[in-house]
Amino acid sequence: MKKILKNDWEPILGPEFEKPYYQNLRQFLKEEYSMRVIYPNANDIFNALHYTSYEDTKVVILGQDPYHGPNQAHGLSFSVQPGVRVPPSLQNMYKELKADIGCEIPNHGYLVKWAEQGVLLLNTVLTVRQGEANSHKGKGWEQFTDRVIELLNEREKPVIFILWGRHAQAKKKRITNPNHYIIESVHPSPLSASRGFFGSKPFSKVNRFLSSIGEKEIDWQIPNL
């Protein structure tokens, strides 16, 4: 059978694709992609795992489900394709980045540079119908992405988990290994950012922790396109 994942996620996550829940999810997605507009493009569904391998993951930024507007989602949480307006939550992340560590605010929202440095930009649900937020909730993706979190939790080498908002914080119970570091606050959404996201300094906290364990810090500056 053709391998879905192209790096070190395949041997540890590959068995999920054979499980009944995933077979059901696959059938559901086949029908959805053939009958509706679904985001992201089917080839981009696993981009978070393709860009950031298991061993290279230093940080996890957990999102909910993909953006549901045209040309936005490309498989990385919070990130949008080049040429698309930066969504409000990401605008707030950029504002906090500037306040926290002085990063200039870029002219786009394409976060691949973070992913390539070991920031796993993972949504808990990996697909969505156009214009319908949470439309693929409860179809099996949660079980799959819970497994991703469990596999990272099993790792000896520390991982920093960034949990913004209640939805992400619900995953905290899966992070039981004391080696790991959890950063929590309200979500960067305009609805909640002023209640504790602004001023929470997550980006400098990440780099301080990485530095303390002898790991290379993340260069958070996204260059203009």
Curated annotation (Swiss-Prot):
It is an enzyme of class 3 (hydrolase). CDD domains: UDG-F1-like (cd10027). GO terms for biological process: base-excision repair, AP site formation via deaminated base removal. Its main location: cytoplasm. Coiled coil: none annotated. Gene3D superfamilies: Uracil-DNA glycosylase-like domain (3.40.470.10). SMART domains: UDG (SM00986), UreE_C (SM00987). It catalyses: Hydrolyzes single-stranded DNA or mismatched double-stranded DNA and polynucleotides, releasing free uracil. The active site is at D65 (proton acceptor). The keyword DNA damage applies. InterPro entries: UDG_fam1 (IPR002043), Ura-DNA_Glyclase_AS (IPR018085), Uracil-DNA_glycosylase-like (IPR005122), Uracil-DNA_glycosylase-like_sf (IPR036895). Belongs to the uracil-DNA glycosylase (UDG) superfamily. UNG family. This is Uracil-DNA glycosylase. The lineage of its organism: Bacteria, Bacillati, Bacillota, Bacilli, Bacillales.
